[in-house]
């Protein structure tokens, strides 16, 4: 597709959201890029400036689409596990930080999260970002920071109720930008 194609057109060309579900979130440039609310992406063109304005980047160009059945905590746990397992271990912020991020997100996903975990995750991710030899540390930190920023209510629900908001009948349909 051409640069500048509306995301809504790209989604249509790809067959839409599976099973006619509601679009919840999109990672427009591969798993290392910040996540964007679905309603924002539906109004966004697939070009560098528009994606930057939405709060993300085109990155690798891989587009990850998540529907309203996606648990954002579980999605972040999977991404964090990848970065933890793939870190080369050469520099301390990435080696130690990716493991710490993964373990805390996993704990939240398992219903063992604690008050303050979200602020701690953001703080640790901010200390990895820009402090590693290569860009891998940034790639590990950006999803954590953006998932918490964009879907904090869902993460907080996991901590407060020890279970997922998705499928509980309490999912917040409001889409914060």
What are the language-model segments listed below?
Residues 1-177:
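Redox cofactor-anchoring modules in respiratory/redox and cofactor-processing assemblies
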């Amino acid at each position: 597709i051409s640069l500048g194609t509306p995301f809504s057109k790209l989604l249509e060309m790809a067959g839409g959201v599976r099973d006619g579900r509601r679009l919840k979130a999109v990672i427009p440039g591969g798993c290392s890029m910040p996540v964007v609310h679905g309603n924002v992406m539906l109004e966004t063109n697939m070009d560098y400036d528009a994606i930057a304005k939405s709060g993300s980047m085109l990155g690798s160009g891989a587009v990850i689409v998540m529907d309203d059945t996606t648990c954002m905590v579980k999605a972040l746990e999977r991404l964090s596990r990848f970065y933890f397992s793939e870190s080369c271990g050469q520099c301390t912020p990435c080696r130690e930080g990716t493991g710490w991020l993964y373990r805390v997100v996993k704990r939240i996903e398992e219903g063992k999260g604690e008050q303050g975990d979200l602020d701690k995750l953001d703080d640790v991710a901010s200390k990895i970002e820009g402090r590693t030899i290569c860009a891998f540390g940034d790639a590990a930190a950006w999803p954590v920071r953006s998932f918490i920023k964009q879907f904090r209510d869902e993460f907080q629900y996991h901590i407060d109720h020890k279970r997922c908001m998705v499928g509980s009948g309490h999912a917040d349909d409001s889409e914060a930008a």
